[in-house]
């Protein structure tokens, strides 16, 4: 029995079972269940944009105005609430978001476009990547022979002042503050008939790298603007380390430091004016750090 005969036999059996009526079997089309999907153009709000100083999560506080007044004095996480022994979901999410911002700032780099826009002289320490930078701080203080020649060729020998910008532990700090603080420093220096020319930008920068730059350039004063280690309050805080005739291996006490430079701390414009005054005092007294007091 071939396939055609088998097919005819099956059709005959089906005809007998249906009472002799021949029916054309048509596969039933699947029914469509219509599900309307609503697509919105909205976006999830950025939880990090909420001003912690104005946020009070305590329900029905006894002195709401007093609580908010206290919060205006500090970015600390006051006025939180809980569910049993645990923080509320919003508080946990904000904590994790701020921590993520801090991590991103450490592992990201200052934009190359910004370095070009500001006409910085780019150099790199002996660190090859972020992992080596974080695990080998000693390499972040030194330059190889090639970088030494780049610094020597692009700076004025024995200048009164050499400005250095370093990414440090926060690229966000440099990108947020450098455009405001440099003009402020330059303007402040004009009051003392001082100026600076080419600015060195150090990638994978540790603070003592300014010491080797001081020895290479022979500058009287070296001022390093560097990103601070970010915290949960801000990732945009920058510091200025200033030293008179820095040398490799010198004591940390010879550095003068201005920290917490950002919009929520010491504004960069205000810090720039103070830095200019400090530089003038160092040149006048020929010292820095604790010796300047």
UniProtKB/Swiss-Prot annotation:
Pathway assigned in UniProt: Amine and polyamine degradation; ethanolamine degradation
Listed cofactors: adenosylcob(III)alamin
GO biological process: amino acid metabolic process; ethanolamine catabolic process
Cofactor binding: number and manner: Binds between the large and small subunits.
EC nos: 4.3.1.7
GO molecular function: cobalamin binding; ethanolamine ammonia-lyase activity
Positions of adenosylcob(III)alamin binding: 207, 228
Function according to Swiss-Prot or TrEMBL: Catalyzes the deamination of various vicinal amino-alcohols to oxo compounds. Allows this organism to utilize ethanolamine as the sole source of nitrogen and carbon in the presence of external vitamin B12.
Family the UniProt entry places it in: Belongs to the EutC family.
Name of this chain's protein: Ethanolamine ammonia-lyase small subunit
Gene: eutC
């Amino acid at each position: 029995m071939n396939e055609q005969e088998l097919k005819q036999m099956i059709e005959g059996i089906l005809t007998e079972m249906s009472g002799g009526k021949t029916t054309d079997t048509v596969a039933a089309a699947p029914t469509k269940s219509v599900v309307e999907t609503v697509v919105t153009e909205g976006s999830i709000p950025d939880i990090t944009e909420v001003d912690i100083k104005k946020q009070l999560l305590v329900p029905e506080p006894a002195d709401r105005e007093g609580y908010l007044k206290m919060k205006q004095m500090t970015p600390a996480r006051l006025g939180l609430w809980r569910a049993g022994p645990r923080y509320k979901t919003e508080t946990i999410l904000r904590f994790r978001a701020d921590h993520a911002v801090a991590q991103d700032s450490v592992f990201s780099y200052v934009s190359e476009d910004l370095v070009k826009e500001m006409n910085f002289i780019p150099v790199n320490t002996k660190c090859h990547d972020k992992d080596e930078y974080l695990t080998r701080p000693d390499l972040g203080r030194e330059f190889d022979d090639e970088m030494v020649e780049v610094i020597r060729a692009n700076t004025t020998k024995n200048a009164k002042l050499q400005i250095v910008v370093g990414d440090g532990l926060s690229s966000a700090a440099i990108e947020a503050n450098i455009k405001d603080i440099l003009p402020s420093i330059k303007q402040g220096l004009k009051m003392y008939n001082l100026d600076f020319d080419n600015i060195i930008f150090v990638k994978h920068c540790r603070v003592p790298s300014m010491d080797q730059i001081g020895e290479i350039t022979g500058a009287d004063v070296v001022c390093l603007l560097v990103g601070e280690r970010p915290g949960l309050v801000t990732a945009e805080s920058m510091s200025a380390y200033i030293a008179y005739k820095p040398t490799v291996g010198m004591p940390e006490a010879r550095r003068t430091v201005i920290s917490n430079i950002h919009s929520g701390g010491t504004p960069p414009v205000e810090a720039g004016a103070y830095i200019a005054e400090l530089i003038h005092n160092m040149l006048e007294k020929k010292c820095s750090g604790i010796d300047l007091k």
